[in-house]
């Protein structure tokens, strides 16, 4: 039903990407800013979220790895992803000012919360530290807002986790044209800290991946998407977000440059090693139509793919 579709989707998605000229490898830094509201305080600490994003072997409350661990595994050790966590800072207005639903059900002012977060952050950091590819843009700004996310069934006044693009602004001589955000707490009741799945999905956008589910449902046709097999689809919620799925092979190969692709040109018997650990385990079969091809990989229940 529509409610289920809404729970499985992220609104305000940015499907456009800045051009990439190099593989997403090496040391990368992201800026994570914790924001409470005038009427909703943060219950977790900066240290709590530093652990969720950065701690190797993170195991708080049943977790099976941190955001750092996730990107280390899915990149086959090629990406070392560190998040600098700042805050929490207090927003000027109550939660409903930012998260109430406006036209089409979209949140009315989450961009204002982002601007307030940046005003606090630039007093403490140098934005040039967050431009790994040297293109003059801040690579990744992620907001963690107090309380729950609307996508988990929280109040309509809550913010829905998303990534958004906007006309670029300039701060400290650096351009910023996107941000992402997820909630402090998981679900819609209780005090459990958020899981890494939604964070990995939204940060996947910042690195250059698109959504792989039907973002407009039946408008212009329907698309079943990559489902639980892909963090950029329903797979961000695998095992309640504890063990989000790997990226699909197209993203790994062509967006991020993490895997090698072997094009098969002759009939024969071929073997595929599990792609969880084998970075050159993808085959390509061209169909004969320009730009149309299949990618083949072997997926097993292992590592962050354990909940497939």
Spans of features found by a protein language model:
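Extracellular hydrolytic enzyme modules, especially secreted metalloproteases
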Residues: 68-70, 140-142, 146-307
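Zymogen propeptides/activation segments of proteases
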Residues: 1-180, 276-308
């Amino acid at each position: 039903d529509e409610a289920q579709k809404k729970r499985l989707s992220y609104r305000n998605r940015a499907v456009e990407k800045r051009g990439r000229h190099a593989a997403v490898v090496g040391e990368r830094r992201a800026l994570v800013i914790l924001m409470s509201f005038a009427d909703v305080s943060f219950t977790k600490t900066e240290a709590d979220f530093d652990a969720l994003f950065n701690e190797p072997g993170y195991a708080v409350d049943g977790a099976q790895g941190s955001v750092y661990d996730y990107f280390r595994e899915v990149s086959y050790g090629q990406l070392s992803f560190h998040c600098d966590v700042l805050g929490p800072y207090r927003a000027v207005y109550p939660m409903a000012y930012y998260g109430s639903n406006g036209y089409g059900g979209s949140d009315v002012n989450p961009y204002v919360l982002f601007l307030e977060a940046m005003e606090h952050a630039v007093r403490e950091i140098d934005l040039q530290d967050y431009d790994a590819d040297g293109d003059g843009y801040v690579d990744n700004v992620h907001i963690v807002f107090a309380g729950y996310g609307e996508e988990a069934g929280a109040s309509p006044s809550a913010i829905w986790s998303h990534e958004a693009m906007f006309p670029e602004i300039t701060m400290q001589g650096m351009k910023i044209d996107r941000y992402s955000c997820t909630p402090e707490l998981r679900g819609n009741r209780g005090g459990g800290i958020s899981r890494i799945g939604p964070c990995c999905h939204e940060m996947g956008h910042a690195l250059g991946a698109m959504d792989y589910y039907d973002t407009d449902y039946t408008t212009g046709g329907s698309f079943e998407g990559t489902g639980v097999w892909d963090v950029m689809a329903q797979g961000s919620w695998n095992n309640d977000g504890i063990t989000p799925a790997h990226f699909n092979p197209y993203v790994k190969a062509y967006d991020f440059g993490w895997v090698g692709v072997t094009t098969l040109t002759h009939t024969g018997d071929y073997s595929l090693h599990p792609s969880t650990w084998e970075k050159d385990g993808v085959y390509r079969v061209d169909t004969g139509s320009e730009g149309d091809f299949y990618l083949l990989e072997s997926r097993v229940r292992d590592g962050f793919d354990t909940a497939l």
